[in-house]
Amino acid sequence: MKPKHYPDTISSPDFSSLEKEIIKFWQENKIFEQSVEKRSKDNCFVFYDGPPFANGLPHYGHLLTGFIKDAFARYQTMLQKKVERRFGWDCHGLPAEMGAEKELGISGRTEIEKFGIEKFNNYCRTSVMKFSSEWEKYVNRQARWVDFHNDYKTMDRSFMESVIWAFKQLYDKGLVYESVRVVPYSWACETPLSNFETRLDTAYRKKTSKAVTVAFELLENPQQFKQKCKLLAWTTTPWTLPSNLALAIGKDIEYCAVSVHSSVSFQHVTLESREKETWIPLSRTGMTEEGTETVTEDNEVSLVNNEIYIFAEDYLEKFIGHCEQNNIPYENCNTKLKADDLAGLSYKPLFNYFKGTKNAFRVFIADYVTGEDGTGVVHTAPGFGEEDFYLCQSHDIPAICPIDNSGRFTAEVSDLTGIHVFDTNDAIIKKLKEQGNWFKTEQYIHNYPHCWRTDTPLIYRAMPSWYVAVTKFKERMIELNKRVNWIPTHIRDGQFGKWLERAHDWSISRNRFWGTPIPIWKSDNARYPRVDVYGSIAELERDFNVKVNDLHRPFIDSLTRPNPDDPTGKSIMRRVPDVFDCWFESGSVPFAQVHYPFENKEWFESNFPADFITEYIAQTRGWFYTLFVLSTALFDSEPFKNCICHGVVLDVKGQKLSKRLNNYADPMEVFDKYGSDALRFLMLSGSIVCGGNLFLNKEGSSIRDVLKNVMKPIWNSYHFFTMYANADGIKAEVCKDYKSTIDSYMIFKCFEAVESIQASMSNYNSQEACKILIDFFEVLNNWYIRRSRERFWKSNLDQDKTDAYNVLYTVFYYILRAAVPLLPLITETIWQGLKYKEISVHLADFPQLERYDSELIAKMDLVREICNSALSIRNTFNIRVRQPLGSMTVYHQSSCSFLESKPLSVVIPKFSPVIPMRDTGTQKEKKWSNAEMKTSMNEYQEMIKDEVNVKELKLVNSLEGIASLELKLNFPMLGKRIPDKVKKLVQYVKEGKWKQVDNEQVFLGNESESYIIEKDEYELLLKTNSEYSSVFGDNKGIVILNTALDDALVLEGLARDVVRLIQEARKQADFHISDRIRVIIKTEDEKIKRAINTWGEYIREQTLSLSLEINIEIGDNFYSKEYQDLIVGIELNC
């Protein structure tokens, strides 16, 4: 019995079960901890682990981000970097508070205060971490290595102290101020939001609003008119009309006037067919062209004789259309007005709520008013619009904001008090109609901002807030952004760069409860003003003479002291009630997670900015942005050097994955069914890692494809090795000398793949690295192993057979380490099975390569291309590979200019543990001469003949009469550069008036008119005249097969079929690959009999058969299998 040095493997393993064994092995042997501890702290690779909330389970987006982080962390660890992977938790803010409110059955500020701030915050402290153990299970199962025991939480005292330190730094630099401004406000959360929070994900979504056109009666007429005049203004927020204090018009807009001149009474009706409110003359009630008119209210109004309506001329067509549609008499005054004719005029307030407001109810010119939307007259409520606020502020009009924190009208709007603003639109419109100020109502669909936590529509509200003066250092942020390597590259100047250009000052205060408190104390007496800002616990303990164990409310609110600037000693320093926007905490992660500057000062300053960060692409307006703001303001530095902005995982319909749609499988179910390596590879190999999206169906078919096309080929090569090595009792070694051409090629091809994977991973391109790995195993399985199978099958264990085993063993030794970041579990399984030196592949270093022969690789790759082209012809015409053919001809002419578009390259590599981000390796181009081509073919002709299964190989150094070159224009590219010339170029191509001048350019035209087109504006295609032909190697040449069959070729093909059937029967009988057998064939087919008689020796050799007999009785001890034309019987030779 030969010794077995490797585990017995099966051809189709349960990858999920194998993975669970590996994860258990890692945990029991502390492999992750060892991989970190063995690296020097002086050689760190730093990446920031963006903190998720632990009050919900991980979804596929979290898994994707985790896979990317883990892949590059493993890669850098293998480059001998120390990569600590502290997990972080986002604990504060709206997500935590909203979850706690729901669980406690309370809602809103009043109920929280009644419940008790201390009790509420203590509940938040517990509930925010309730899914942390579940997170740990998911993260561990996805084979992601993180440190859960040394994690950071934004609610930790140390983290919060660093946050208040950062704020004090900003304050001392003059980058913090308090101001009343109009800000996005979530009435559902009772807190303001920052501008960038309104740009997160799908914050903007479709909303149908009642848009109303309102007539404002002027108290002073323009000089041109003596009749009563009204300005028409259009708004999508009728609920803001009670707070109207001004009207705005455009400086460059031309206004017109229309007279409505007959006294007609109108009644309010609903046109059922149009689902729209309007007014019609009482004399015309009944049927109209639009449908049945149903009276819904008894309100009547009259248009006074000769009222003048004024609006932008661009609105005239809509005005007339509305009048004619509703039979409202009108007459165009043909009078044009300028903005100066209207500016300064006063008008009658719509309502009396704020009638006496100083400087209000006048018409002002504003730069932001256009005639494109609406009427060219903008209703202005300074308490509810940013532009409104600044316009009124410039005219000394106060910002009136008569709503409470929950979005309900206060007592100032007496008849609507306590009603939510969005529920008052109908009542306000009704009142406008009764007063004669209403002109028209319509349903208006528009994109409107919603709260990112509650999905409720936001309002804009004037309120006090603390701001970071981002606009003061915005230009520096733009400069620092140029230093960052963004993936994809367009993010730098595109999505993120443009976001920086539009950056506003950042509202960082939230009038909430669970968060880091803003460390500002103010005097409670305006006569003795004083502001104190604290940046450490020590400062607080010094001034308030108390031990500070917790920085949360309400403890922090209880810290008061007499105002040192008040000689009376009566005024008290009290903290402002706000807490920080939780995004301020997220932006503090780089320094706060290590308690800088109170601890780890030297380490942080030596390892900032971070080497790497990744999140999904919308974080360009979220976390990436806040990191940039604080990093620039505090350290005058970019926060990270490399950033991957990945895309989003969607279902096959392009919808986000959600429980409501039931359009995704639980990740744990996917792990149990397919394993996590398959999902990992699917994500790392797709365009999603560079900003695209991944479409995933609930059945997981794309994950199943990875099992079939990636995992299984890798396993097959390993299974092949262990099965044959155990059968031969061989213990393979990592080899240094490669005797045969194919062995050398396979080792060098492995080196090339490893080097390319290293270059891709150093450039943060896992997609390319995955492709290289797939291509490599295609070569290993379908070229080397298949081409070498007879070496493994032969009975004697000679040096040639030993070399084949050693080559496979060596290839695994290198490629497994390179594949670790992409497939950490299957590589570990195979590594342990092959018993290399390290107990875990994750404790090994990335391969240090030897120099290799790139020219040999180029030659063999060319051979493979020729073979693949020939086999594609067989496939096209359904000619099985087992059927030998008479001949094939390779036509090649490297001296032809059109064949030099992409010459073969010989790469002289530069070896080092780390390949630079930009490849600086020297490349030399090699053009194949006719003589070299023929030498190459002669050297490899037996290999080609055997692979393609042809008897003769011919090489012809000419393409004349066989192929022609076709020029294909790239219309999109040409259309951008010379759109008016494209038609002419097409004509020149049809007439054949073109030639390639060099590898880059093509000349088109004649002596009188000509054009040069560049490489990216065209494509050259080699076209052949024979149907049994194929182009190979990017226009390098043509392969033509002779498909004619004579009797000898047919018999040989049948003999090969018999071999296949015998081997299939052997497999089904569960015989071992090395078992010697006896074979009986029963058939009445004369051609098969002749084939067996002619090729008997060949059949016996190929099937390890000691005997091969025809049409004798198959005994009971034989395993038999019936096929279409014959029966195969096989028996073990005992």
Swiss-Prot record:
It catalyses: tRNA(Ile) + L-isoleucine + ATP = L-isoleucyl-tRNA(Ile) + AMP + diphosphate. A motif ('HIGH' region) lies at residues 52-62. Pfam families: Anticodon_1, DUF5915, tRNA-synt_1. Keywords: Aminoacyl-tRNA synthetase, ATP-binding, Cytoplasm, Ligase, Metal-binding, Nucleotide-binding, Protein biosynthesis, Zinc. The keyword Metal-binding applies. InterPro entries: aa-tRNA-synth_I_CS, aa-tRNA-synth_Ia, Anticodon_Ile_ABEc, Ile-tRNA-ligase, Ile-tRNA-ligase_type2, M/V/L/I-tRNA-synth_anticd-bd, Rossmann-like_a/b/a_fold, tRNAsynth_Ia_anticodon-bd. Catalyzes the attachment of isoleucine to tRNA(Ile). As IleRS can inadvertently accommodate and process structurally similar amino acids such as valine, to avoid such errors it has two additional distinct tRNA(Ile)-dependent editing activities. One activity is designated as 'pretransfer' editing and involves the hydrolysis of activated Val-AMP. The other activity is designated 'posttransfer' editing and involves deacylation of mischarged Val-tRNA(Ile). HAMAP family: Ile_tRNA_synth_type2. IleRS has two distinct active sites: one for aminoacylation and one for editing. The misactivated valine is translocated from the active site to the editing site, which sterically excludes the correctly activated isoleucine. The single editing site contains two valyl binding pockets, one specific for each substrate (Val-AMP or Val-tRNA(Ile)). Monomer. This is Isoleucine--tRNA ligase. The gene is ileS.
